[in-house]
């Protein structure tokens, strides 16, 4: 370091490093002489890459990273192409940066844009991109800082808004492994698996607890969202049989879920979950919506009617004065009903708009300095779900009321880690989780603007 500071040259040897330290602490140093510094801008760049040889084991088949094109491209080809196309790529990056900041600011204000910018890279980088033998895209998430599950459905679900906005093919890549797992007969339960393994081995579910209503609702809702974004239900048509199985499961078991896990599994099992029930109703309605898009009118009418019947029962079972309960059997409780956001965004229109308005008004009485708690049981929250709850009514003032404390948390938290989605609302400190893809859910407001323009 001292030599470099004096003459700008690297000696090739690190200062005061013992042989043992050298084994443990590999150091790479690089210098580039940019000439005399004056008023004119001078820049340089360095290409750094990593070849993991095989990225993912997918049902006992080792798959290379997508960029390698089944071995037709190696790391040296990638470096050469990167160098050749450097200027153009940097311009594309800068152009997209501007686009993202402009359209998210237009959707929700400058502070919302800053939250989205903070989330963008993290939401993508928590995945590996590969293809299966047939060339189907697989965009496999890792559950960072929880249990390391790969391809978790209830990680895909909260992250989806960003990918629906910018690249629905990547969302399909998250869903493809779950469809394959069921359609291949490897998973034979009447609801989707929770995951397809433990990173980096996607050989089948390893998580100890199923989430039957949770994952069925997630897959049906996301398939519906893709259909609306693309203007057709072709993707759903490819998987219609298994989607039908899941929709029928929700018709039977979804209105008043038994003692099972949902995506907020850190809070433990509990029965009669009203927000989970909404997810089931949205899943049934979504199936009906897709059936209509596929010309299956009788099926569409039947499932949409069932969803409305379920919603009517939900209202009478969940009502608790000026709000709606956490669980059907416990008065004096409350929770964020973030799953309700899809009713308006996907034009399902199953619930009266008064439900969202009533809940939103009540949430304002429960908000803390750094956000709205997840429910009445704890002070902590999930910031991705807050950004969904903020979109329940479509009202700009309501959105800002709930979004701004999340920005304040991200800006002021003393937990200086890759953005945590699970924090305490009273003091803004991390409760757990970090560097996870679920922050793609921050893009719900942008998705709303795109769907409702």
Indicate residue ranges for each PLM-predicted region.
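Terminal, non-catalytic domain-edge segments
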Residues: 405, 420-453
């Amino acid at each position: 370091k001292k030599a470099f500071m004096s003459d700008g040259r690297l000696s090739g040897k690190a200062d005061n490093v013992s042989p043992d330290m050298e084994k443990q602490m590999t150091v790479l140093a690089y210098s580039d002489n940019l000439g005399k510094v004056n008023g004119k801008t001078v820049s340089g760049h360095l290409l750094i890459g990593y070849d993991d040889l095989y990225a993912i084991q997918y049902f006992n088949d080792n798959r290379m990273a997508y960029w390698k094109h089944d071995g037709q491209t190696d790391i040296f080809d990638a470096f050469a192409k990167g160098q050749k196309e450097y200027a153009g790529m940097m311009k594309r990056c800068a152009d997209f940066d501007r686009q993202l900041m402009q359209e998210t600011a237009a959707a929700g204000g400058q502070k919302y844009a800053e939250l989205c910018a903070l989330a963008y890279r993290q939401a993508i980088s928590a995945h590996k991109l590969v293809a299966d033998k047939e060339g189907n895209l697989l965009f496999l998430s890792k559950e960072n800082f929880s249990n390391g599950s790969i391809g978790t459905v209830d990680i895909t679900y909260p992250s989806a808004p960003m990918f629906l906005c910018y690249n629905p093919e990547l969302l399909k890549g998250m869903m493809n492994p779950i469809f394959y797992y069921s359609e291949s007969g490897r998973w034979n339960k009447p609801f989707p698996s929770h995951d397809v393994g433990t990173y980096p081995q996607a050989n089948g579910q390893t998580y100890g607890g199923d989430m039957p209503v949770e994952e069925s609702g997630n897959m049906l809702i996301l398939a519906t969202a893709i259909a609306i974004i693309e203007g057709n239900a072709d993707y759903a048509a490819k998987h219609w049989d298994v989607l039908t199985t899941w929709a029928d499961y929700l018709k039977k078991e979804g209105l008043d879920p038994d003692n099972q896990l949902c995506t907020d599994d850190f809070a433990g099992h509990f029965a009669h979950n009203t927000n989970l029930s909404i997810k089931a109703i949205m899943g049934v309605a979504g199936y009906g919506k897709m059936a209509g898009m596929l010309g299956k009118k009788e099926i569409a009418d039947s499932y949409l009617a069932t969803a409305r019947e379920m919603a009517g029962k939900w209202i009478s079972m969940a009502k608790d004065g000026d709000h709606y309960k956490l669980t059907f059997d416990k008065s004096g409780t409350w929770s964020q009903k973030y799953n309700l956001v899809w009713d308006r965004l996907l034009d399902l229109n199953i619930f009266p708009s008064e439900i969202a308005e009533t809940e939103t008004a009540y949430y304002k009485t429960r908000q803390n300095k750094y956000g709205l708690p997840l429910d009445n049981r704890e002070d902590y929250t999930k910031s991705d779900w807050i950004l969904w709850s903020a979109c329940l009514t479509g009202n700009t003032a309501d959105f800002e009321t709930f979004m701004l404390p999340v920005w304040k948390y991200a800006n002021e938290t003393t937990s200086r880690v890759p953005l945590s989605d699970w924090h305490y609302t009273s003091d803004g400190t991390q409760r757990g989780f970090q560097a996870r893809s679920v922050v793609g859910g921050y893009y719900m407001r942008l998705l709303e603007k795109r769907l409702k323009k």
